[in-house]
């Protein structure tokens, strides 16, 4: 993951500095000093929810951000910027064929062993955050400039969802007193089912952020920024419930309403012990950003 981020950043910087050098070779006219910039921007690239797993595999995802902001320059080369942006983070989790068993009771309070076989499970997660950045920007040159910015961001989760509806799950119930395993009674929650989809809950995120690139002065007071950015999440945003959910939930009142919870907020039972799928969730983004200011 870190190697991929470095690769994306290096490619972006080579492109940006090459472009900036080409512009710098042209004759520059001194531009009037601007102390205020209002900007619209967008960017994209690697934008993922990162987490470690106790079983299965996690894969990073791609996303982006859009927003508007304001820069105030104390002097020509140094300024402070803030704004509001919407950022999307994605990730996926996959798990090969796996079996889960646990004791529970049915609608008649009869004890049985719930057995489930999960085939080619895949879960996609998507989070949209409202982010507020605070960045210090340093820039060089007059007309065509290089710039670097560093600071932090606060992210408030607005929309967080998961979807595992394509997964295939085969359930059965073993009743020890009868010494019989029920496999096709879907009204009892036994048989073939699909995964689920739904909403998730995450905590507020805190980032350390950096951006570097070229700033091109255009006509009519417009300025174009093209740069590479990195947003690195500092805290664990997992919002663990007081009572952890089971990955597979048997609803004894409505057995056919079988539910598969997200791996981000659930645990699984194996050999009488419970284990969480994930231990820490942090957002991470790296990509190319374009800003237009006036």
Give the location of each predicted region:
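Cleavable N-terminal export/targeting peptides
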Residues: 1-34
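Short N-terminal amphipathic alpha-helices
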Residues: 75-85, 91-95
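Short proline/glycine-enriched turn/loop segments at secondary-structure junctions
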Residues: 2-4, 218-220, 276-280
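Extended, basic/helix-rich recognition subdomains
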Residues: 213-215, 222-243, 258
């Amino acid at each position: 993951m870190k190697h991929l981020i470095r690769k994306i950043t290096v490619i972006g910087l080579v492109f940006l500095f090459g472009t900036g050098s080409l512009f710098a070779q042209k004759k520059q006219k001194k531009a009037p000093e601007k102390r205020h910039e209002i900007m619209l921007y967008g960017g994209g690239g690697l934008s993922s929810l990162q987490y470690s797993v106790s079983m299965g595999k996690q894969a990073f995802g791609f996303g982006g951000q859009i927003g508007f902001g304001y820069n105030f320059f104390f002097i020509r080369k140094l300024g402070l910027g803030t704004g509001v942006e919407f950022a999307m983070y994605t990730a996926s989790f996959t798990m090969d064929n796996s079996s889960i068993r646990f004791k529970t009771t049915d609608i008649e309070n009869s004890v049985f062993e719930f057995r489930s076989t999960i085939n080619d499970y895949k879960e996609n997660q998507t989070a949209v955050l409202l982010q507020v950045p605070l960045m210090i920007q340093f820039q060089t040159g007059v007309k065509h400039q290089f710039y670097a910015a560093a600071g932090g961001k606060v992210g408030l989760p607005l929309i967080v969802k998961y979807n595992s509806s394509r997964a295939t799950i085969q359930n059965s119930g073993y009743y020890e007193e009868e010494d019989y395993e029920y496999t096709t009674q879907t009204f009892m929650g036994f048989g073939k089912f699909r995964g689920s989809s739904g909403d998730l809950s995450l905590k507020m995120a805190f980032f350390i952020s950096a951006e570097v690139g070229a700033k091109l002065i255009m006509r009519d007071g417009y300025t174009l920024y093209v740069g590479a950015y990195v947003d690195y999440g500092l805290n664990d945003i997992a919002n663990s419930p007081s009572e952890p959910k089971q990955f597979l939930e048997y609803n004894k009142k409505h057995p056919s309403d079988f539910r598969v919870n997200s791996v981000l907020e659930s645990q699984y039972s194996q050999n009488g012990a419970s284990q969480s799928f994930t231990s820490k969730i942090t957002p991470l983004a790296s990509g190319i950003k374009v800003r237009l200011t006036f």
